[in-house]
Amino acid sequence: MDKVGATSFTAATEKDWEIAVRQGRQRYIADAGVAALNLLKSQKDEPSNGWQVNNYEHSLSAATKALRNGEDEEYVVAVLLHDLAQDLDPMRHDRVAGTLMKPFLRPENHWMVANHQVFQLGFRTHSKFDTKACEKFRGHPFFEHTLRFCDLYDQSCFDPNAERLAIATFEPMVRRVFGRVMQARMTSYP
Ligand SMILES: [Fe+2]
Ligand SMILES: [Fe+2]
């Protein structure tokens, strides 16, 4: 990799900019999705807060079930990464994950990730929160899509004996889903 001599933006020559921008774009495309995967992997050995699986295992279990059920690749990726922001902001981790993944997901999958917490509440039999809170969204075009996700792949994926494929199984999928959009973004800038 070429390195420029400048140590500030103001000192960088036109050639420096050409080198740094070109190499940056190539790397962003080559490594698309890796930052999201790394965030998920950072949860690998974290405590489970009393559940029988931790958040990382829950995520792998959910993605494995989605894959086995024949869901499409982008949906499997959305399932895998739906809780990647759990530790950043537990009470609004869906919004944070949704913001991170918005450019890379279809609208229905983005909305599903970004709003899953309020739908997940509907499956709780014990809660001080309003378990019917998702009703405010009834009629929304992605209501049923999100409810189905929470039922099939979120509330029901905390079993330590459920199949969990290795993260390596999903890495190429994440790279493809993020890479498609990254490629388009990087080549659309002047
Ligand atoms: Fe969640
Ligand atoms: Fe979850």
Predicted segments with their positions:
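Metal-dependent phosphohydrolase cores
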Residues: M1-L80, L84-P190
